[in-house]
Structures are given as structure tokens and as C-alpha cells.
Amino acid sequence: MKVAIVGGGIIGLFTAYHLRQQGADVVIIEQGEPGGWSKAAAGILEFTRFVINRINVRSYPKRYLSMALRGDARIKTWDWRWISAYLRAWGREPTQDMWEAIKTLGEYSWRQYRALAEAENDFAYSEEPLYEVGIDVAAALEEAKRDPLSPKVETGRCCGREALVYLDAAKLSTEDFVARMLRELQGVQMVRRRAQEVAGREVWLEGGDVVKADAVVVAAGYWARKFGIPVAPFKGYGFRTTAKAQSMFIEMTKGVAVVPLPKWTKVTGRFDLDGTEDHSPSARVLQRAREVLGNFEVLDMSVGYRPCTPDGFPIVDKVGEVVIVTGACRLGWTYGPALGKLAADLALGKPGVEALTARRFRR
């Protein structure tokens, strides 16, 4: 069976990985560098904690407006269909079925990363605490007690301040992990072209060529909006730097995540509703990071567009004959292994997970 995957980000790569394990012939269609749009992520994995994605809680618009007024967020892409879906989802609590699905995604992904690291840890995988500073720690502890995923948290100190310590976290080097996945996928056909349209089992490429397959998976982030999926691009910036840090932490008041790795320290920031190629806010990330870390050199910068649904939960569904996997927002890396497996299973004719379908936005 031949499966064409549109999108070579982390979820597209995991989809290809699982399809290949099940004996499928796979072709990945990606206009840029495979994994290129995913490298900007910090590499923080939060398997039992979803709070960072809860963008539809009633308090979130006020928080986002505060970020924008401080200059730490902006809106450049006005997708009125997405905004309309957001207003309908605003304040809506997830179903128990959704929480069960998310719990299963986290458990599966955790096992997958561990297994890959045990085979060869060439991507700096490490399970260690994540510190959050600049928050109301007491309130966060109370919130964690009510969390359906039962995250392990405690009070600690980081950067000379009181912090919430999330104990189930892990980290990896996104750059090194993409390289690892490409080695795992040696022999998979890579088509470095832009996909213009998907029609049933055909992918029409820029220039007029057509890729035909027995099944098509679209794992191309917010491009899924072409299929009527409510998903929007929230841009972020990632820097490999020479900064020094003892622990993995997020400075919430400045909107900066810091991940120390063996060869560099990753610094990331911004959550801009922005699908443009204007990357000028990246300077603000560095400014904010230097307020925390002092001066450092930048080795390189990468940009990513997090595909976010109005409720922050991912979608794995079929639209006609096409499998769509998107919408994991800030947790695409955390749930990448499991979402790739679900997308692969759908492409092979296996059943999906009802809670993760797009039907929840049509109710």
C-alpha cells in the first residue's frame, strides 16, 4: 500500500515512521527542509499536563490581551472562521472522553520517546523537572490537584525565585531528533515540492505534477484549513544559543522558555496569531531572554507556526478520503508519536478516536 504524506514536520515524520513499520510504501511531500518548521520548538515534553494548551478557558483572552499590550504577542492573521469557532468553544469544558484520549496520547508518546532513546540516545533525551517561574505557585498547585491528567507537581526554586516544579517533564534536542527520524526513514521517498491541492488519493504539486497513492495524510499544520478544519497559525521563534542555565524552565512573565542541552541552550518564545513571514518580533524574544539569562551569543534561529484548534486539542480525522492530523498547538512534540500512530492507522483503514475528530466543532 502506498501512502502520501503532505507535510514533513514532526507529526508527518512520525506518521511516516509508523506507516513504514506496518509495511506501507511512503512518500513525504514537503516544500522545505523536512522537520524545518518543527525545529523552533523548545523540546519540552509535558506528557501529563495540558494546561499550556487550554486557550479557550474564559480567562485566556484577557491574558492574551495583556501579553499583546506588553508587546509580547500580536495578531497579524485574522481568520474569521477560526475566530467564530473559538467564540463557540470559549469556556466549553472538555468531555471525559477527550481527557481519556489525551491521557492515552501522553502515555503512548512517553513510551515511544523512551524506546527510541534506549535504542540510541542521539537526541539528548532526558527526563527532568520543568520549573515555571513568574506565576502564582499556590494557585497553580491547587489547579494541578483538579487536573484530570493528575500531573506530579511541587514547590521549588529556580532563578532565585519560587517556582512550580513539574516532575513528569522531559526534554530533547529538536534539531537532533529530526536528524534521528530522517535516519530512521532512510529509503522513504522525499518530494521537495509544494502541494497545491489534495483531491481524494491524489496530491497536485506546484508545476503540474501529480502524486498518486492509495491513501493521503495531510500533516501540514494550519494548511489543513483548506479542508474546513478550524486551525490557526500561532508563530514562535527558537534560538540555539550559548546561554548558561542549570535547569529547564519557563519564565511566564516574560514568555521565554529555556532548555539547557549538551551542545547549546535552546531559547524560545512568542505565541503570535501570525501566518506572515515578518519575523521582526524575534528581537523581542532575545531581549526578554537576556533580561533573564544575561548576555549570550545566538548560533541560529528557526521559526515555527503552531497549528492550534479553537479548544487547543488536536484533530485526527478523515475528510472524505483524506486523513487530517493537526491542531496540537504547543504540544505537537509531546504528542507527536501518538498522533502519528493514529494518523497512520486511519490511513490503513483502522478506526480512529471519536473525541479527536473535527465533529466537536460542528455541534
Curated annotation (Swiss-Prot):
Catalysed transformations (reactions): D-proline + A = 1-pyrroline-2-carboxylate + AH2
UniProt topology in membrane: Peripheral membrane protein
Protein residues bound to FAD: 3-17
Superkingdom in the source lineage: Archaea
Subcellular location(s) per record: Cell membrane
GO cellular component: cytoplasm; membrane; plasma membrane
Keywords: Cell membrane, Flavoprotein, Membrane, Oxidoreductase
Molecular functions per Gene Ontology: flavin adenine dinucleotide binding; oxidoreductase activity, acting on the CH-NH group of donors
Cofactors required: FAD
pH dependence remark: Optimum pH is 7.5. Half of activity at pH 6.5 and 8.5.
Thermal behavior of activity: Optimum temperature is above 70 degrees Celsius.
Main location: membrane
Keyword Membrane found: yes
Complexes and interactors: Homotetramer.
Family per record: Belongs to the DadA oxidoreductase family.
Protein name per its UniProtKB record: D-proline dehydrogenase
Organism: Pyrobaculum islandicum (strain DSM 4184 / JCM 9189 / GEO3)
Taxonomic lineage of the native organism: Archaea, Thermoproteota, Thermoprotei, Thermoproteales, Thermoproteaceae
Gene: dpdh
